[in-house]
Swiss-Prot record:
This is UPF0073 membrane protein Mb1114c. GO terms for cellular component: plasma membrane. It comes from the Bacteria. Pfam families: HlyIII. It is a multi-pass membrane protein. It is found in: Cell membrane. Keywords: Cell membrane, Membrane, Transmembrane, Transmembrane helix. The chain crosses the membrane at residues 42-62, 67-87, 108-128, 133-153, 159-179, 186-206, 222-242.
Amino acid sequence: MSGQADTATTAEARTPAHAAHHLVEGVARVLTKPRFRGWIHVYSAGTAVLAGASLVAVSWAVGSAKAGLTTLAYTAATITMFTVSATYHRVNWKSATARNWMKRADHSMIFVFIAGSYTPFALLALPAHDGRVVLSIVWGGAIAGILLKMCWPAAPRSVGVPLYLLLGWVAVWYTATILHNAGVTALVLLFVGGALYSIGGILYAVRWPDPWPTTFGYHEFFHACTAVAAICHYIAMWFVVF
C-alpha cells in the first residue's frame, strides 16, 4: 500500500496542474520582488573587494603581520557576507530547497560579519586579555547564531534580530579602552556604524518603511543601512591599524 501511495504522490507531482502551480508561484515571486532587491549588496560586494584589498595590503606592508591578518579576516567576512546576500536576493531560485538553504546562509553570514568586524578591534585596539575575551564572545556568539539559523530557519525575527544587536554592541563595555588606543574618530565611526546596523535591523524586523514595494521597500532600507554602516567601520579600521 505504501508503494502505491508513493507512486500516486509522484504521479500527482508530475501533473500539469502541479507544474502550473509551481510556475505561478515562481512568477509571483519575481513580480513581487522589488526591482532594487539585492543590488545594493551586489555593488557593496564589488566595492568590498577593492577597498578590502587595499586595506590588507597596506596593513601588511606598513603595519604588521598581525594587522595584515586581522584586516584579512575582516575583509573576507565582509566580502562573503555581501556576496552571499547579493546572490540570495538577486537569483530567482527555482528550487525551494536551494532557496531555503541560501536564506539560511544569508542570515548566518551576518553573524560571521559581526565577528569579523570585531577581530581587528579586539587584537589591535584592546589589551591582550580583553582582546581574547572579546574574540571569544563574538566568535562564540557567531557560531551559536549560525547553529540557530541552520537548525531553526523558521525562527521569528523577534529571536534573530535581538541576537544580532546584542552581539553587535559588545564594544560598549570597552568604550574607554577603544577611545584610548584607537582614538575618538575610530570610536565615533564604530558607534555610528553600529547605530546604522541597529536601525537597519529594526526596520527589517518591523517591515517599515515600505514606500515603494515594487521598487524600494523596507528590505532595501535595511540593506542601505548595512552598506553605509560598513563604510563607517571600514574607515574606522584605518584608524585602528595606523
